[in-house]
Amino acid sequence: MTDRKTLVHSHLHWRNVKRKHWQKDLVAKVVELIKVGDHDALALVARTAGIPPQLRKHVWPVLLKFHPMVVSPNIMSNTLVWDSQHQKWHYHPEIRSEDEIRDQMAHDLGKYFHKRTSAGKRAQSAASGPGAAPGGDLSPLPPGQQRVVAALQQCILKFLQKWAQFFKYESGLAWIALALAEWCPLDGGEDVLPGKRHGAPVNLYHEYFLPEEIRDQLPSESEFAFDELFERLVLVILHSPDIPKAERLARAESEMTSVLQYYPVISGGDLSFQCQLFFKVFSVILPELYQPVSDEETLRPSKKTNWMYWWFKCSGARVFHKQDRARIWDTLLGWRPHPRSLNFYLNYNSKLFDHLYSTRTSSALDSEFFHKICKYGHDAFWFPDLDSLSLGSQDLKCDFQVLSELVRRNKYDNSDDELEITPKNNGTVGSKIKKGVEIPFSLLDPHVQLIFIYMAILQQHEFKLLEFEEAEISEFFNNVPSLSRADDHNYRSLYEEEIESRSVSSSETEPEDLFKRPGSSASTPHMLIEVGDDDKASKSFDDLYNLAGDIWRKWIWRELEDNAGT
């Protein structure tokens, strides 16, 4: 028995050593891509392998600068509400005074820094949603944290002043700003917020060490100021297609049938559609777990169900661990559809900006590295023939047309007369010289991808969740346990030889903390309930991401089979 246990630990050790070698290679490659300015390759790395924590403050600004949803934005509005029955908009402007909004902001931001002193207070605070009123017994913050709150307030107010016609303040903006400040310094320096430990700002490179010789190769200044970065991030997180326009197009294209064929599982829908799709997929993929979660009491509008607000509208802000949320945001910020298909996903767009994107990487990303991050040479959310369709073309304007074509192509008696297929080897947009490798572009809207990532998280924890009571399930959704603990520990100790050789004279470094695993007694636990530390729950996020792709294919194949005869 002892020999077997030793063998298992030895296997895990060498697997982890191999993983750390790969992560060092990833750091080196990302630094090289930053130096040559290959934003297309950086986006590919972000959505497939994730950006190393040490480098997000350099990469996220580049990804946001060229993100399609930033170049041509359209956000879900909480001031304009579309009435599909009467085909008109209803406007609900902000009625709070600026002082009231500032007070609410200060209250929301202040919660980040206050430690929870009891289970009751913690659960109550975690469940509070965007409409929570200011108040409570929160003690005054230290001066340093007050400065952070004031800076973030100013940043959010700038966004609201610019987008006031479409969006008024809600708590999600505060927690998105806080989450961004966990990776991108407010002042352009190196200090970031610590995450779930509710402490003062920490030096990023003390948390995730990076040798001086590597740091010297990185840009000294950021692409954007923090408030500019925040605005661009919010444009991605709150993105929404033009729903009235999409419905009109679907109605026009489906005039041969009596049923409106609006089902944007590829191009993406609004927040309501995302929630509906989540529960539809949930009922098919995890039917046993779906029952307790979809119980009438669980879904009744209350503080318990505000996890849906944080998961879907805020893309994991507040309820996910710092490391896991950042990895999820890597996939959001790295999202890139094929340049020819931009308008299929951005149905409101009137700009011409496909020239910003290349279909091939620079020579800095070679074939060997490419096959490490894309083992099968395509997007994680692939489906047979989907990447060969010219989405948005004359015959493929709507999702239902794309799905119908996929059904037709995947039938056994498929004929040869197919719609336009775009060749795989089509070079670089605007260039005759081929270089690097061909980029496998994103095929699903990024917020639809999130649904399947969330489903993979639930599948990974299914058996434990089935044992939980309703209150424990609610706690899980409002405080998701760490998903990539092993990866985070590796990045914290990636250059441990260099750390050990450094002088320990600086009291700020506190090197002993660098080797403690996240979630140890040194930090405030994120979950009040124990979900286990087994190997399955501590896998790399890459495994979870690939599982999400598998779930997508399983679900959409069943959907196509069920609707093949309609």
Swiss-Prot record:
**CC per GO annotation:** cytoplasm
Keyword flag Transferase: no
Q: By its UniProt entry, which InterPro entries does this protein fall under?
A: Rab-GAP-TBC_dom, Rab-GAP_TBC_sf
Residue ranges for the region (Disordered) are 120-140, 500-522
Low complexity compositional bias, start-end: 123-139
Where, subcellularly, is it found? Cytoplasm
**Keywords, A to Z?**
Cytoplasm
Q: Which residues form a coiled coil?
A: none
The record's section on SMART domains has: TBC
Task: Enumerate the spans annotated as Rab-GAP TBC domain.
Answer: 50-336
Similarity comment: family membership: Belongs to the OCA5 family.
- Recorded protein name is Oxidant-induced cell-cycle arrest protein 5
* Species, as recorded: Lachancea thermotolerans (strain ATCC 56472 / CBS 6340 / NRRL Y-8284) (Yeast)
